[in-house]
C-alpha cells in the first residue's frame, strides 16, 4: 500500500499543497509551527476520517475558507484508487473514486495508517480513557466488525444510564442483559487483539531498545476478576453487574463494562507507568505501533503507512538508530517530521524524498 500523490486545499495553515511522495521514506523538515504535523494529520484523516489531534472540524478548515479538501491516490496490488475527504463546519464527507461513501465498510481498509506522535506517551502516564481509545482504534483498524459491536454497546449503555438516572427499575433487567451480551463482544475482541500482539510487542520492544526485557500487556476489567472472565465470559460480566446493581442505582450510572476497563503495560513484572523510564515508555509505545503495523500487514496482505511526528526528539540516540535500522528492513512507506535533517539517518536508503516546510508551504 503506497500513497502515490496527495493534494490539499485550505487545510489548517496549508493553502494549496500537491506532493508526490517517495515509496519508502519521506522527511518533512523545518522549524516548529510551520505545518509539518498538519501534513501528517491530513494523511491520517484520509485513512481514518479522524484527526489524531482530536480537533473540531472547524479547526481544520483554513481561516477565511468554507471547506477543506484532502485528496490522495493510493496504490495497492497494482490498482490505484482516489480518496477525497471534504471537511466543513458541519462535518466530513468522503468520496472513493469520485463516488460518495455512506457506510464505513466501503471506506474501511483503503488506506491503512499508523501514527506515532509525542503525545502518545500520555497513553502510558495518563488516564484509562487514553489507553481504551488506543486499543479501540487498533482493534477497529484490523476488524471493521468491532466498530459495529462497539457502537451497539455504546447505544445500550446510554439507554441503560438514562434509566438508572431516572430511578425507574422497570425494564432495567432487559438493558442489563443486553449490556452484558454486547459488552462481552467488545471485551472478547479486545482480548483477541492483545493476545495477537503479545509476542510481537516483546520482539519489537527489544529490537528498538536493544535489550532483552520481559514485556507484557494485560487487560484489566473494572470491578471484575480477569481470571474468572477468561474461564466464564458468559457469566462473569453478568455476575459483576448483579453485584453492582444497588450501587449503580444509587449513583445513577453503569459501573461495570468495557467502558470502564483498563490496560496494564508491564515491563519486567513491574508497571511501566510507575517504574519505567521515559526511554522505556517511549520504546513501549513504539513497539505497540510496530505490532499494530504487523497485524494490519497480515490482515490486508499489505503494510500500512507509518506516520512519525517529531520522532527524533522523543528517543535517545541509540533508540533512534535502532528504530531507523528496523524501519529500513520494513517494506512500507514512512512519513517523518523533524526540525533538522541531521536528526535522521538516511544512509543506505535510496528511495527517499525530503521536503522543507515553511509558513504553510512545502518546498521540494
From Swiss-Prot:
UniProt KW keywords: ATP-binding, Cytoplasm, DNA damage, DNA repair, DNA replication, DNA-binding, Nucleotide-binding, SOS response
Main location: cytoplasm
Pfam families (UniProt xref): SMC_N
The keyword GTP-binding belongs to this UniProt entry's keyword annotation: no
Any one GO biological process: DNA replication
Keyword DNA-binding: yes
GO cellular component, one term: cytoplasm
Protein task: The RecF protein is involved in DNA metabolism; it is required for DNA replication and normal SOS inducibility. RecF binds preferentially to single-stranded, linear DNA. It also seems to bind ATP.
NCBIfam families: recf (TIGR00611)
Name this protein carries in UniProt: DNA replication and repair protein RecF
Species annotation: Geotalea uraniireducens (strain Rf4)
Taxonomic placement: Bacteria, Pseudomonadati, Thermodesulfobacteriota, Desulfuromonadia, Geobacterales
